[in-house]
């Protein structure tokens, strides 16, 4: 039976008579945005009894919330939720911050169990519980928020979450991913909560300067493409902004772009389903060097950054001047964290081709600084650990430059180990002298091989023939034979088991009948481990921050292998020293990680 509770006395009476030390919990809110949302109501289920507490327009709202605060602090010892970070931040917004650490998120549990599927509550309930006739929030709310239909809708979320948790808990132990779930993933739910509560301050002046500069670059590139293609246009000023804009009867959609590329005597192995040249990123990289293609490639980058990042951010800024991205813990099959609204992962570095300081729009509050703590060369260190290659492990232990090492092997430079040590007298000079060879070692072989790039791909990236690229690959594997052995071992395991596991036991299921699966499998061994390392590091640093409230430190962003903080200036030295040590020793591995610390008033200065 579902109980609708509205008065404080009814709420007290319901919980006083029942054991809710272990229960599932779900919230209904007015918004998904932390800064503006309010909890409309919440539902609880303990396996026997279910209730929905309606707080919408409730005159006893404050008293009931105070009682719930007491309930969470003193009675509830184990809490089950679906998409735990969201429900946790809703509670936080209502002032309910003393919540048990013993939580179970069914969304994250399912992501570990079946990384290739949808993890929504309704989809999982249909799949595992065979529930039918599931209403949406919009459908249920039409009946009124205290109607039997809406109460059933709200209570079902708690009931289904409870039932799914029983299924998934058993499965986690069967698949031997229970430790990863309880020791890494569940503490990380609180880190995600912090990220989405804290947000980061945006400098609106810099944002507008950036928009104007990037818009001008986009306009310049568009005009250049029209000129190269011989397409007519006229210029006029936008009636609202005064900025120049092009008017032309000629469109420059994908079909027209493909026709222009063909008319320039170019072709590409990348085709559309209809057999035409694809004008995607692969084709543009393949055909680089042509002035139209190069202009189009840059235009696409600038246009995407403007349309999906710069021009969208103003509408995402809350009235306290901060933007709060949504972090998705279950959005990638490798375990990597993703973000949206805005996507913090697509924040490019300033470079000569695109001289725009995207990171400069994010700044610290007065009296504080932005701190960037970035795992330096993490993927190569993890490659050494995953492969067990003695040469690569020894290189990191002796502080050798792995990119110069690979360049040395591929080009036969004849450098000694001593010369390639970062601390040696000759290193700086040799690094500059062999900058090209080092660059090829880094971007032509070290990183591409992690991603399973073939000789064709390396040839395309480095501008050499496939034969030369293959010779370079052979030299790479002769230098690091443990890497070749690890790839072969991964291939054999995938063929036999149809899945691979990272060192943290995270799984990636792939079809061995597809060629790309083998590249993805080995890359996952590194990406899966990296994703859990950043989680573990965040969890440990979060606990340290809680022990030092005087730091006034906040985790404000996670970007790939980097954790970004905002810290009070007086405590920067002691805080960054602790953060660096914790991150470098976050996991018990044969090699310690290296963390680079950057500090600045803006995110750009910290990088």
Task: Annotate each language-model stretch with its function.
Residues 1-55, 116, 127-128, 136, ...:
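Conserved "right-hand" nucleotidyltransferase catalytic core of DNA-directed polymerases
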Residues 24, 76-87, 370-372:
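Acidic beta-strand-to-loop metal/phosphate-binding motif
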Residues 32-33, 42, 85-96, 110-113, ...:
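Short active-site loop/helix that positions an aromatic residue
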Residues 45-47, 84-144, 164-167:
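Metal-dependent phosphoesterase core characteristic of DEDDh/y 3'-5' exonuclease domains
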Residues 47-79:
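Nucleic-acid-processing active sites and adjacent nucleic-acid-binding tracks
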Residues 63, 570-577:
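Short, conserved charged micro-motifs
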Residues 197, 218, 244, 266-268, ...:
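Conserved catalytic core of nucleic-acid polymerases
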Residues 480, 581-590:
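A common structural junction motif
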């Amino acid at each position: 039976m579902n109980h609708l509770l509205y008065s404080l006395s009814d709420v007290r009476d319901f919980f006083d008579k029942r054991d809710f030390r272990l229960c599932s919990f779900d919230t209904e809110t007015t918004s998904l945005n932390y800064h503006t949302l309010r909890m409309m109501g919440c539902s609880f289920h303990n396996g026997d009894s279910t209730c929905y507490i309606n707080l919408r327009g409730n005159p006893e709202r404050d008293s009931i919330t105070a009682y719930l605060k007491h309930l969470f602090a003193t009675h509830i010892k184990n809490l089950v939720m679906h998409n735990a970070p969201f429900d946790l931040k809703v509670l936080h917004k209502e002032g309910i911050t003393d919540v048990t650490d013993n939580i179970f998120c069914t969304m994250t549990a399912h992501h570990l169990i079946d990384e290739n599927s949808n993890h929504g509550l309704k989809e999982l309930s249909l799949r595992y519980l065979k529930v039918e006739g599931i209403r949406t929030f919009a459908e249920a709310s039409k009946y009124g928020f205290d109607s039997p239909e809406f109460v059933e809708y709200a209570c079902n979320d708690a009931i289904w979450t409870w039932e799914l948790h029983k299924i998934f808990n058993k499965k986690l132990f069967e698949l031997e991913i229970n430790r990863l779930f309880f020791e890494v993933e569940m503490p990380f739910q609180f880190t995600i909560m912090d990220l989405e509560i804290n947000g980061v301050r945006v400098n609106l002046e810099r944002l507008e300067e950036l928009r104007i500069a990037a818009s001008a670059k986009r306009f310049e590139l568009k005009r250049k493409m029209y000129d190269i293609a011989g397409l007519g246009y006229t210029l006029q000023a936008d009636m609202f902004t005064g900025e120049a804009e092009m008017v032309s009867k000629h469109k420059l959609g994908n079909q027209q772009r493909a026709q222009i590329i063909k008319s320039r005597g170019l072709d590409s192995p990348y085709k559309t389903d209809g057999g035409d040249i694809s004008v995607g990123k692969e084709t543009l990289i393949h055909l680089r060097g042509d002035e139209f293609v190069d202009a189009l490639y840059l235009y696409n980058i600038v246009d995407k950054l403007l349309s999906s990042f710069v021009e969208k951010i103003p509408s995402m800024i809350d009235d306290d001047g901060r933007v709060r991205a949504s972090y998705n813990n279950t959005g990638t099959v490798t375990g990597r964290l993703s973000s949206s609204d805005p996507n913090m992962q697509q924040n490019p570095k300033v470079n000569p081709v695109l001289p725009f300081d995207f990171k400069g729009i994010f700044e610290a509050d007065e009296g504080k600084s932005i701190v960037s703590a970035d795992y330096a060369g993490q993927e190569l260190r993890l490659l050494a650990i995953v492969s067990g290659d003695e040469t690569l492990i020894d290189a990191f232990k002796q502080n050798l430059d792995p990119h110069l090492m690979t360049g040395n092997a591929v080009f036969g430079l004849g450098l000694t180990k001593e010369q390639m040590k970062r601390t040696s007298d000759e290193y700086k000079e040799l690094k500059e002298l062999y900058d090209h060879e080092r660059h090829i070692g880094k971007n032509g072989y070290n990183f591409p091989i992690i991603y399973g790039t073939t000789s064709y791909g390396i040839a395309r990236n480095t501008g050499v023939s496939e034969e030369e690229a293959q010779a370079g690959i052979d030299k790479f594997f002769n230098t690091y034979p443990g890497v070749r052995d690890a790839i072969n071992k991964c291939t054999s395991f995938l063929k036999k088991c149809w899945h691979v596991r990272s060192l943290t036991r995270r799984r990636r299921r792939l079809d061995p009948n597809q060629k790309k699966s083998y590249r993805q499998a080995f890359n996952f061994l590194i990406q899966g481990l990296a994703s859990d390392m950043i989680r573990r590091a965040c969890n440990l640093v979060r606990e340290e921050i809680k022990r030092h409230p005087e730091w006034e430190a906040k985790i404000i962003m996670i970007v790939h292998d980097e954790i970004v903080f905002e810290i009070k200036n007086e405590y920067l030295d002691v805080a960054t020293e602790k953060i660096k040590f914790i991150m470098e020793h976050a996991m018990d591995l044969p090699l310690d990680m290296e963390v680079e610390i950057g500090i600045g008033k803006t995110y750009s200065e910290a990088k």
